[in-house]
A protein has these predicted regions:
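Short beta-strand elements that form the blades of beta-propeller/WD-repeat-like
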Residues: 42-103, 141-157, 199-206
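Beta-propeller fold detector
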Residues: 119-124, 179-184, 232-240
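Bacterial signal peptide processing site
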Residues: 18-22
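Conserved beta-propeller blade repeats
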Residues: 127-147, 186-202, 238-242
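Sec-dependent bacterial lipoprotein signal peptides
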Residues: 1-16
Length: 242
């Protein structure tokens, strides 16, 4: 009996701790209309930027910006690497490959080649995870367009914008101008895809129908597309399953 209780007690502790660590909702609803909560400033972080990226075929340099965390008297990057100075990891904000920039990026600055001036993408607090240059659209329509997946609202009301908030989708031109949200507030971006033959950008979002703060199979999937040959970037909704 003594041996049995020795095994049961840790299991009970594990069950209790798992219940305490239940996944927090991505959305906390207050009123019918969106409330913009103040973002808490983290005084342990300093702003840094990667060296500029030149996307082939464009006349702009892109400067990814992020944050470098200083904790417990030592330096820590967003990736979790800890050291006094680690040139390979600690100061790296983003990665670039095949016309796509990835990372946890707080903003961008754009610089036209031949100019010394840098232009900020947005004044809003955001967290960008991916930026994709639509090269085939540029080749076909002469429009140089970037697609962003990012969080732009503190939807779970924890005082910060991070990967625990709802992800949405934006577009801009290669200079950072026309930075436009094409997703809907409080709808989680599922995925997006470019049909090169028609220059149509398709994307899906999930609406929290039951307002339980979580996104699951009981909620509604919305289907959208944009004809990128049109410069107004008008979003159309369609129903492939009806």
């Amino acid at each position: 009996m003594k041996k049995l209780s020795t095994y049961i007690f840790p299991i009970l502790l594990l069950v209790v701790s798992c219940k305490e660590e239940e996944k927090k909702p991505k959305v906390i609803y207050e009123d019918a209309k969106a409330v913009v909560a103040p973002i808490q400033k983290d005084t342990t972080q300093i702003k840094i930027a990667d060296l500029p990226i030149h996307i082939e075929g464009t006349s702009f340099l892109v400067h990814p910006m992020g944050e470098y965390s200083l904790t417990d008297g030592s330096s820590k990057s967003n990736s979790g690497a800890s050291s006094a100075y680690d040139k390979d990891e600690s100061f790296k904000v983003s990665n670039y490959n095949d016309y796509e920039i990835t990372g946890y990026i707080s903003n961008f600055k754009f610089q036209k080649i031949g100019s010394d001036s840098l232009r900020l993408l947005t004044e809003k607090p955001i967290l960008i995870e991916t930026v994709t240059y639509l090269k085939t659209v540029s080749d076909k329509t002469k429009q140089q367009i970037l697609v962003y997946t990012l969080a732009d609202m503190d939807t779970n009301k924890d005082g910060k914008i991070n990967s625990n908030d709802i992800k949405t989708i934006y577009l801009s031109d290669i200079s950072g101008n026309k930075f436009t949200k094409i997703g809907t507030d409080f709808q989680e971006l599922i995925d997006w895809n470019l049909i090169e033959a028609t220059s149509h950008l398709y994307f899906r979002t999930l609406e929290d129908i039951n307002k339980n703060g979580a996104f699951d199979k009981t909620d509604k999937v919305h289907y959208h597309f944009i004809n990128l040959q049109n410069k107004d970037w008008k979003v159309e909704e369609y129903s492939p399953i009806n």
